[in-house]
């Protein structure tokens, strides 16, 4: 699946690049654990304290239950502090990496603008090509009306691109000429 290369900055912080493709939950967990290991450890400790308080409550030991509930609150607070500190250090680390590689917001915006303009030029060229081809194609069927020489009934024939191609190839088109209900006008 995704292969992440872990880089360590001079400050000692670990930088794990994020792939643009699909990242499964195991890869995401391992990446997040490597970025900030205190958060998952704190979550496990919080769950452990909550389970211990439930066990003590079932045993009828209310003082021990209160101890584990207070421990859960403290551990949860430490976990949240680790989460905030980790996100702040990651933000500072990413800023350092951007400065080191020279990729800043301005260069990102310029690159996106250039990519957009190149796609726009390609779309305009395709539009002009389609417009040039549209002038050379047949636009819809042409209708011919004529009077049948023997019966005098007026008939109509639609010439479509398929019918013209079939006529040129010497075949008969699968749809015959459709008669029109109007009688010939004399005059």
From Swiss-Prot:
Domain HIG1: 10-101
Annotated stretches, region: Disordered: 133-187
Keywords noted in UniProt: Coiled coil, Membrane, Mitochondrion, Transmembrane, Transmembrane helix
GO biological process, one term: mitochondrial respirasome assembly
Membrane disposition: Multi-pass membrane protein
Annotated coiled-coil segments of the chain: 95-132
InterPro entries tied to this protein: Hypoxia_induced_domain, RCF1
Gene3D superfamilies documented for this protein: 6.10.140.1320
Aminoacyl-tRNA synthetase among keywords: no
Main location: mitochondrion
GO cellular component: mitochondrial membrane
Protein's cellular compartments: Mitochondrion membrane
Pfam families per UniProt: HIG_1_N (PF04588)
Annotated transmembrane regions: 38-55, 68-90
Family affiliation: Belongs to the RCF1 family.
Family matches, as PANTHER family: HIG1 DOMAIN FAMILY MEMBER 1A, HYPOXIA-INDUCBILE GENE 1 HIG1 -RELATED
Entry function: Cytochrome c oxidase subunit which plays a role in assembly of respiratory supercomplexes.
The protein, known as: Respiratory supercomplex factor 1, mitochondrial
Gene: RCF1
